[in-house]
Each structure stands twice: as C-alpha cells, then as structure tokens.
C-alpha cells in the first residue's frame, strides 16, 4: 500500500487491518482524526526542541529519525511505506524532543494527533487496542534494534536489515545506513562486499 492518493478512509482501513478490527462506526471515528501531511525531500517533520504531538504513518516516502551526540549525527530509525514513527519520549512526556525527523524523499504521511486519539480511545475499545498495539510495536522495534547493536556482528546487522527492510537498503543513503547500524561507512562497504560474495 504505497499509493500517495490514498484517502483517510483507506488509511483508517489499513491501520485497522494491521492493528485492530473495527466496526464501521469506529472506522468513521478513526478516519476523522487522521491528518494528511506532505513533505518535500529534505523537509523537517520534527525539529530538535519541538514537542512531538503525533504518531505518523508513512503512505509514501522515506523518513529519518536522528539525534546529535558529541557533535555527531546518529541515525536512530528510518521509516518507509506502511510504517509508524514518532519521537516516543517527547510524545508521552510532552517535553521538547532531543531527536529530529526529516524526509529523505518526497513523503506523504497521515498523522494521528495524540490528544484526539486518546480522546476517542476512551470511548472506542478497538481504537484503544489500536493505540496500545502501535505503542507496543514501537517499543519492540526499539528493543530489537538495541539488541541487534549489542549482540550482532557488523555483517549480521547488515544481513538482518537487508532481510527485514530491503527497500530501506536500496533507497537510503549509505552514510545513514552505516549510522543506523552503528558502523563506519568503510565498515559498511566491507560488509556489503562480504554479503555479495556470500551470494555468489
């Protein structure tokens, strides 16, 4: 599902299919809180110091979530089509984000404003379930990435990324892939060569 002309109804249906079965009325309510957004390549979606107020669903495009440490940019996450992203700590603490998010390609997003989503979740059990499953998924993805960085070799990290998100490997700049996998561009180059040799 990467059609940039998708309607809010289409997106509501896809979210329901992925996270929680919904009645027709619940789909109407979920559709009503969805906010369409478009970003050009290079646009900031969330700036450092802004408070994250939305959960985002990528319809089309590629986004990068990153932060600065000791003056160096570090990529924490990248999202392609049919993927949720957010600055989760900022979203829940309602504090300025230490992370930044920007579009690496022309990007179409539907946003779920946290306050509106929580308001409708109070009265709609299936939307409450959707909200909980989205948050669970986000935390699990973060934990798996942290475990991969702790326990996997550079080659295994790259193999896992190729298997789990081949589109990301094809579309994201190599410098960001290297940062996401916590290796230098030179190490990534060697790892990519080793992975190609394995296929032959």
Outline where the language-model segments fall:
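Phosphate-/nucleic-acid-contacting segments
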Residues: 152-200
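Short, Lys/Arg-enriched N-terminal segment that forms or immediately precedes the first helix
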Residues: 11-12, 138-147
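Short phosphate-coordinating micro-motif centered on Lys-Gly-acidic
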Residues: 45-50
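Glycine- and acidic-residue-biased ligand/ion/polar-headgroup-sensing regions
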Residues: 42, 53-64, 81-82
